[in-house]
Regions:
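Conserved short secondary-structure transition element at the edge of the structured enzyme core
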Residues: 56, 87-145
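Structural preference for beta-strand elements that scaffold enzyme active sites
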Residues: 21-26, 48-52, 125-128
Length: 168
């Protein structure tokens, strides 16, 4: 891809000129946006340039609070609806519903499952979490204790095959 070639070019120029090397790249990455895997992940792994992912919960969609098109009063989607067009795509709700079913099937918190999936990627250096409330922060931090089984990963990857990157 263009981004992976560009990243590779930057890395090569840094080496050619003995400049300090790039250590990380900050990109969005979530169950709804795995586009980093197309080209950039390979360069990240090969050149040891870690990804610092932001929006692992897709602005709250992967917490489950916006399921079925409902936007709780005072939520960012209710408050700033016109700003968040990235997530209003044809397959967003379908993918979210499938991820929700996986989390329930395996007795996982949907937010924690989503964050942990990001964290476990080989190219990932760190996952930048955010929270509006202390309860959300505690839930997100607790994701470090979550273990995703091979079955969970397989089911997550199957959703990606059916609804690839609904919110790039």
């Amino acid at each position: 891809t263009t981004w992976s070639r560009g990243l590779g070019d930057v890395y090569k120029r840094q080496n050619d000129k003995s400049l300090p090397r790039m250590m990380s790249i900050q990109n969005p990455y979530s169950l709804l946006n795995r586009s980093y895997e197309v080209g950039l992940a390979e360069v990240s792994i090969r050149e040891e340039i870690g990804c610092l992912s932001y929006s692992p919960l897709a602005s709250g969609y992967l917490s489950g609070k916006y399921r079925n098109g409902k936007f709780p009063k005072g939520s960012r989607m209710e408050r700033d609806f016109d700003f968040w067009t990235r997530y209003r795509k044809p397959n967003t709700e379908k993918a979210v519903e499938e991820y929700y079913k996986i989390s329930k099937k395996y007795d996982l918190d949907m937010s924690q499952m989503s964050i942990k999936f990001c964290e476990e990627q080989e190219f990932m250096t760190s996952v930048i979490i955010g929270a509006t409330t202390m309860e959300q922060l505690k839930t997100n931090i607790e994701s470090v204790k979550v273990k995703l089984s091979e079955e969970v990963i397989k089911e997550i990857n199957n959703v990606q095959k059916i609804y690839p990157n609904p919110c790039p």
